[in-house]
Amino acid sequence: MAKLSSINKNEKRKKMAKAYAGKYSRLKAAANDKSLDETDRLVARLKMAELPRNANPTRVRNRCALTGRPRGYYRKFQLCRIQLRDLANKGLIPGVTKSSW
């Protein structure tokens, strides 16, 4: 089980990234738009730098829904590999069977 503080910190980052998603994407698009003047692009970059660090979506870490483990994460199930294997062996994940050939 991951530390509760790490899980809570990540949840806080998710909320902040979601709150600033529109503004962040508009500024990023303006900063990368080659048709704009160089000064306008620079202004967009400076405004992006003024946003809170946790508003950046790359700071959000995918974590297991059951344990909070950050590594070995399967997006389709939102579980880490250990919990996925455990639940699949118990038959609690529909459509997942043990491989046999």
From Swiss-Prot:
Keywords, comma-separated and alphabetical: Ribonucleoprotein, Ribosomal protein, RNA-binding, rRNA-binding
Record-level GO BP terms: translation
Gene Ontology CC: one annotated term: small ribosomal subunit
Keyword Membrane listed: no
TM regions (residue ranges): none
GO molecular function: rRNA binding; structural constituent of ribosome
Function comment: Binds 16S rRNA, required for the assembly of 30S particles and may also be responsible for determining the conformation of the 16S rRNA at the A site.
Similarity comment: family membership: Belongs to the universal ribosomal protein uS14 family.
Protein name: Small ribosomal subunit protein uS14
Species assigned in the record: Zymomonas mobilis subsp. mobilis (strain ATCC 31821 / ZM4 / CP4)
Lineage, opening ranks: Bacteria, Pseudomonadati, Pseudomonadota, Alphaproteobacteria, Sphingomonadales
